[in-house]
A protein has these predicted regions:
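N-terminal secretory signal peptides that target proteins for export/translocation
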Residues: 1-4
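Sequence-pattern detector for short linear motifs
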Residues: 7-8, 30, 232, 498
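Beta-strand-centric surfaces of beta-sandwich/beta-rich domains
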Residues: 105-120, 148-347, 352-487, 495-498
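Bacterial N-terminal signal peptides
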Residues: 8-18
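Aromatic- and Gly/Pro-enriched helix-to-coil junctions and flexible linker segments
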Residues: 22-191, 199, 203-207, 275-281
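Compositionally biased, intrinsically disordered/low-complexity regions enriched for serine, proline
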Residues: 13-14, 22, 33, 56, ...
Length: 499
């Protein structure tokens, strides 16, 4: 393929108009300045007096809430029947209006109006849905005609698998934690997968199964689970079955409580080889605070078809700092910055902010020339560590040389309900009382040909050159003919390959 080169200066590209609507509250790095999202029903053509549970609210709850808020679903209350929901109506209005900050429900914290808004498995509420909920509660939360109710969702008897039954389930060892006691860190061993052939993984979902009754009246995530997080790898077992063969190991996305499944798009996939095992090498367990609990992690793998080979090379997240950070006590709006220059064309698959208890917000930017493109800003709640997987047509396509900039916002004041003590300085560390500032998201490296193909597909989706795709800010950049220097470089490269 002939070399192509884009203009280094982006002055010819128009920056997108600011998408932040006047109706949205301004977000910063302080908890004290958090404001709810409040909407008028009339702005969405909604007659506030006609909003009822049966006709309007039940469908919203089915889509975005009942996977957890149902009998056996893991949440502290059921939100299925009207008599269950009515008593929580004011609380539902309050928690949904928080929207993208700690404490919000449902826990999907992408800030609207800023950057890319197309994500897989997005169960967040729209502006219109928030307006509907607020109108319903303000009007007395009427039930309406039960004939308007949608058909009930048939949920599984247990907490089930979010993505459906896996092709392979690998069970970790049972671990027991006392009702009250110190946290436990460490390696909990190897778990063979039982695979007899190499398979590429389409998705992996990790869930905790424990002996806490599903109907227990628990109001915190930490009271229901004992595994806070798990770092694990895979590889081929050695002949003795006592370890992994050197050179065959690879790391998997970290499991964290409240985290959604990892989905690897077509063209990617992670290899789980024959005669392999999972190495559960870094587990963090804690007491629930109210009962002795025995639990284990189950790893649910779904595979691409046999014979599948990935097209792309996997890369990691966008960087950050988990060691050398200085978090000051009793101060809101603290900012931490990390920069990384891309050495390859890159497609970002998922953005996953990882902070600790003081964390409030993280933003992801791409810097090209003199221009800065805010790809996303996402709120953070250490009780619900989430990854945000881009829809394929919206995933950021970044040329090599792009500077990827992440900004973390921390608040160590008493306004932050996740903070144990506002008085102490804290540095980096693995415990929740220490701090991290990392993007754990996923990306892939692209060849020049793959990059050009991806951009051509994105351009084909646009109506004309006035359309704008912030995830592909190079899509409409004019190409220029290769220079003599480019030709010389190609010649030298070809000679090197032939030697």
């Amino acid at each position: 393929m002939s070399a192509r080169r884009f203009l280094g200066s982006m002055a010819i590209l128009l920056l997108p108009p600011t998408a932040l609507s006047a109706q949205y509250p301004v977000r910063d790095g302080t908890v004290a300045n958090m404001e709810p999202y409040v909407f008028a029903a009339a702005d969405f053509g909604i007659d506030a007096s006609s909003v009822t549970f049966s006709k309007d609210i039940a469908p919203i709850l089915q889509r975005s809430c009942q996977s957890c808020h149902r009998e056996g679903g893991g949440a502290p209350m059921s939100l299925v029947a009207y008599n269950e929901v009515r008593r929580w109506a004011p609380r539902i209005k309050e928690r949904t209006a928080i929207r993208d900050r700690m404490g919000a429900m449902p826990p999907f914290f992408v800030e609207p109006g800023i950057g890319i808004q197309d994500f897989k498995n997005d169960y967040s509420l729209s502006d219109g849905e928030l307006a509907t909920i607020q109108a319903w509660v303000d009007n007395g939360a009427p039930e309406g005609d039960r004939a308007d109710l949608p058909p009930a969702v048939e949920w599984p008897d247990d907490r089930g698998w979010v993505l459906g039954e896996p092709d392979l389930v690998v069970q970790g060892p049972d671990m027991t934690m006392p009702a009250v006691g110190p946290d436990r860190w460490g390696d909990i061993g190897l778990v063979p997968t039982g695979l007899t052939q190499d398979r590429y993984v389409m998705s992996v979902e990790v869930r905790e199964v424990n002996d806490i009754p599903t109907d227990a009246d628990i109001t915190t995530v930490g009271g229901r689970y004992i595994f806070h997080h798990m770092t694990y790898t895979s590889g081929q077992l050695n002949d003795e079955g006592s370890g992994l063969v050197e050179g065959t190991t690879q790391g998997w996305p970290i499991h964290e409580v409240g985290r959604n499944p990892d989905i690897f798009p077509e063209g990617l996939g992670m290899l789980l080889p024959a005669n392999s095992a999972l190495s559960l090498r870094a587990s963090h367990l804690h007491s629930t605070g109210w009962r002795e609990t025995t639990g284990r992690l189950e790893f649910g793998f779904r595979f691409f078809p046999e014979g599948y080979e990935p097209e792309y090379r996997r890369a990691g997240g966008s960087g950050g700092n988990g060691i050398d950070i200085d978090v000051r006590p009793n101060e809101g709006g603290q900012e931490f910055h990390s920069y990384r220059v891309l050495e390859d064309h890159t497609k970002i698959i998922a953005f996953e902010p990882h902070l600790h208890a003081p964390g409030v917000r993280m933003c992801l930017e791409a810097i090209w020339g003199t221009n800065r493109f805010t790809l996303n800003c996402v709120g953070y709640d250490h009780n619900w560590v989430k990854q945000y997987i881009y829809e394929d047509h919206a995933a950021p396509l970044l040329p090599k040389g792009t500077i990827v900039h992440i900004v973390g916002f921390l608040d160590t004041t008493a306004e932050n309900p996740n903070l144990a003590d506002t008085r102490n300085w804290a540095g980096g560390g693995r415990r929740s009382v220490a701090n991290m500032f990392i993007d754990l998201g996923q990306s892939v490296r692209l060849t020049e040909e793959q990059f050009q193909t991806e951009m051509a597909e994105r351009r084909a989706r646009m109506k004309d050159r006035n359309a704008y795709d912030i995830g592909c800010f190079m899509c409409w950049a004019p190409e220029i003919a290769p220079t003599a220097a480019d030709a010389d470089a190609q010649t030298q490269a070809a000679r090197g390959q032939n030697q």
